[in-house]
Amino acid sequence: MREGGVPPPADAMDLPPPPPDVVHPAAKFCDLPGSVRYETTGVTMVAGGQTATIPPSLAFLKLPTNFCVHYYGKVGNPRQVRFAPSGELFVASPIGITTGGGAGGQSSIVYLPDDNRDGYADSVSIFQDRLPQTQGLLFTKTHFYYQDNTKIVRVPYQVGDRFPRGEREIVADITYHQSLLHWPKPLDEADDGTIYVGNGGDQGEACDLQRPFKGGIVRLDGSPGGLPIAKGFRNPIAVRCQRGTNKCFAIELAKDYSAEEGGREKLVPIREGDDWGYPCCATRDVPHVEVKQTADCSKTVPEDVSFLIGDTPFGFDFEPKKWPTPYKGNAFVALHGTAGPWQGARLVSVAVNLDTGDLMPSTTLGGVGGGMRNFGTGWDDTTLMHGRPAAVTFAEDGRLFLANDNNGDIIWIAPFELER
């Protein structure tokens, strides 16, 4: 038996995926049965959707006109979503205590194929089990990487694999600081092959003027624990790289309840040597109140993209330039909203300079401004019935997939003209 896994049936890795049932003739994704379409004249639904199990209503959701939303499937506590090169949606479903508080985790990485291409997941199957603390997922040309608590491990991967191929290998054991709450280790690969991993700090850290590494970004360099390259993070909850630019970014969930002292959540570039301030500084020249007289924040890197404390940016990905203007190439960010009422839970887009790959200055401080737009809203209608937006990924075909960690629903969104 594989370490930490389940044995596949004989020759399972050599079997092709199950044959598709009936492939719907729709030429565009938004014409598939079950699609909720946002027309200029109102909201309509394409008849003939899934009936074996009744999908949840998506009537609460508000999107721009000429877009559609479609239910895909359900996984308890989906904390990260990634597409395999062969099209299966992989989902990290942990049970370890997390800031999201999602229920029904499977302590596994599961996958959801759509072999008949009807827009719904065909099934939910376990790829790797016995993973109570897992979040980071990454496919490279040769391997599948994933988080197992403090460890980043990998298994050989070939297109179409639905079981681990061979023994797992520990790539790094990141123990510079081990947070019981901020244990997730998101990761991604830059265009040049560099892999970056987030490592969480803690809410109650005292300001140490020597600035040791605790929460920050680690580069996998072949050493046992990886190389710390950027510090001053409380909780780098998400890491993503933008294709074609060799640039990577991270979301920082900053000090709770610090809005009145200048605190803000951030979406920042990953660069070697950067110090983003925590736990001493909220941003450049803005020390946290308890160290106002002692902390020097003049060298803290200023952010270009900021969010109100409590908006709680949770996951993001970059649109692969298949959507129309003004969304082409944007970063799409899932906002988890405030604890309790989930106020502010929504999906926003952040404009990107398509020539350089840089994020345009954007903020939700004092209202949505700069290069940021509200894209999907409706989760925070006080009912607590629709989940909280958590993980985001784009499929190669251009659809945006969004997972809600509190109810497990996974949906996809597409513009009307996106072809299958």
Language-model-detected regions and their locations in the chain:
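Beta-propeller domain segments
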Residues: 19-64, 184, 201-205, 212-215, ...
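Surface loop/turn motifs at the tips and blade-to-blade linkers of beta-strand repeat domains
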Residues: 71-76, 125-132, 171-179, 227-232, ...
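Blade-loop segments of beta-propeller domains
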Residues: 77-79, 104-142, 375
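Beta-propeller domains
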Residues: 60, 85, 89-120, 158-160
